[in-house]
């Protein structure tokens, strides 16, 4: 049986949002789209700025375009001190990338700004050391 937006649509939507016990899927078909260079990476802030950084993240991410993924997190800075970070991946037109992330670069006093052009695969591998194979995080 095939389920899609147009064929067996009720089953398709049930599988999409029905949780882990709705049925057994034996194969998937994906439509892939090429992704060139993206603008990605983290900007780290001192942990003492966590409240302000989270409020900034809340406001910034709500107004961000669909081409920008933005995540807030807590973790160690390269020197070992506790920090908060905004991790971003901008996949839109390259000429608009810097303009889109400018508010992040202008916010607060970053400990480190590692936002840079990279491949989408590099963005996907950014947290590999923190989530090793076998933990089933995806």
Predicted regions located by residue number:
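Soluble FAD-dependent oxygen oxidases
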Residues: 1-138
């Amino acid at each position: 049986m095939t389920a899609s937006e147009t064929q067996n649509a009720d089953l398709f939507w049930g599988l999409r949002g029905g949780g882990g016990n709705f049925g057994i899927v034996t194969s998937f078909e994906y439509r892939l789209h090429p992704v060139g260079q993206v603008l990605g990476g983290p900007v780290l802030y001192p942990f003492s700025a966590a409240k302000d950084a989270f409020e900034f993240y809340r406001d910034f991410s709500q107004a961000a375009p669909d081409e920008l993924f933005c995540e807030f997190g807590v973790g160690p800075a390269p020197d070992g001190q506790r920090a908060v970070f905004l991790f971003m991946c901008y996949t839109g037109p390259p000429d608009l990338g810097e303009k889109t992330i400018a508010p992040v670069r202008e916010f607060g006093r970053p400990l480190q700004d590692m936002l840079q052009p990279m491949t989408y695969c590099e963005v996907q591998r950014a947290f590999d050391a923190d989530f090793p194979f076998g933990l089933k995080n995806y």
